[in-house]
């Protein structure tokens, strides 16, 4: 489906890391907060845990549980998508764009936001702003485009 991605992966130019969605969000949030790492049970005993530090901690009931160390993400560049921005970089997200754009923006040294509309400073209702302009270094007014995805592939469920 993506021949260039396939070529880079097979030639060793590109690495793939498996990371559960919630763990990815927390890794970005941790990086944005300056937290170098955290322990989680998510992924223990799976491919996700291979090569990572394991440590046992007691749970709430005192039962020892194995956790894996996940490192915070500290990016050089974060590229995010927002619905609307004002001239000072305050952003408003819509729908599912509210999920990962905020932690993605904060974990990058430089944040570039592509937006659908730029309004004058002071035009956005402060109660509607999702990300303060202090986290945004550049705003790019995007052109309308069709959102294209690769072919959806799902695994059939086994029947009992």
Locate the predicted segments by residue.
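Conserved alpha/beta enzyme-core scaffold
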Residues: 1-160
């Amino acid at each position: 489906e993506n021949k260039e991605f396939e070529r880079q992966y097979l030639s060793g130019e590109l690495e793939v890391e498996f990371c559960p969605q919630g763990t990815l969000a927390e890794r970005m949030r941790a990086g944005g907060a300056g937290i170098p790492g955290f322990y989680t049970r998510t992924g223990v005993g799976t491919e996700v845990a291979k090569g990572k530090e394991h440590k046992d901690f007691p749970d709430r009931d005192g039962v020892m549980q194995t956790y894996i160390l996940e490192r915070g993400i500290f990016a050089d560049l974060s590229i995010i998508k927002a619905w609307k921005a004002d001239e000072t970089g305050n952003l408003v997200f819509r729908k599912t764009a509210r999920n990962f754009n905020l932690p993605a923006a904060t974990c990058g040294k430089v944040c570039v936001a592509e937006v659908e509309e730029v309004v004058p400073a002071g035009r956005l209702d402060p109660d509607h702003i999702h990300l303060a302009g202090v986290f945004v270094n550049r705003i790019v007014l995007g052109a309308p485009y069709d959102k294209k995805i690769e072919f959806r592939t799902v695994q059939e469920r086994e029947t009992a």
